[in-house]
Amino acid sequence: IVQSLVGSEMCIRDRIHSATLMHDDVIDEGTVRRGKETLNKVWDNHSSVLIGDYLLSRCFEMMVEDGNLEVLKLLSSTSSKIAQGEVLQLQHKGEVDMLEETYLKIISAKTAELFAAATKVGAILSNAENKEKDALEFYGRNLGLTFQIADDTLDYNAEVKLFGKKIGQDFFEGKITLPIILLCLLYTSDAAD
């Protein structure tokens, strides 16, 4: 039964992730993700938002059916934090002088939160001790931060064929990421010298 629940919860987590990516592509007006056309490019923004909303709604129905309130609470909170991260990112769109601290808050609320939840769900479903749950959540959060920083770096040094979008696309969309923040710090530091 645990194996069945783990499979179900991982499916739920994956659907939540897919829904957030659909919404993210609409917000960012993205047309390519990992070398493939986005849903909003293939269909339209309205369809993408509705399908993303449906996936989220269906995920919560599935969690209620599974009956694990700890998982339901965790993934509900995670979905809320991801949305808050999106709002924070929108508030700072195009803000070239954004602080590294703000950038880290954004990616913590989005990618890191999703990774943390994914690793913690496995611990919850295997009836792990709180110490183990916390350790896996910590690991997932740091893995998410690392993944997002690496992904943001690819925007400036990846091959277009492999990355699937134009180099610098995040910057042109007004997304200020760590490479730009560090470049600005380096430039202002050099200018001061």
Which residues fall in each region the model found?
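Single conserved hydrophobic/aromatic residue that forms the stacking wall/gate
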Residues: I1-I12, Y187-D193
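Mg2+-dependent prenyl diphosphate-binding active-site environment of isoprenoid biosynthetic enzymes
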Residues: S8-L186
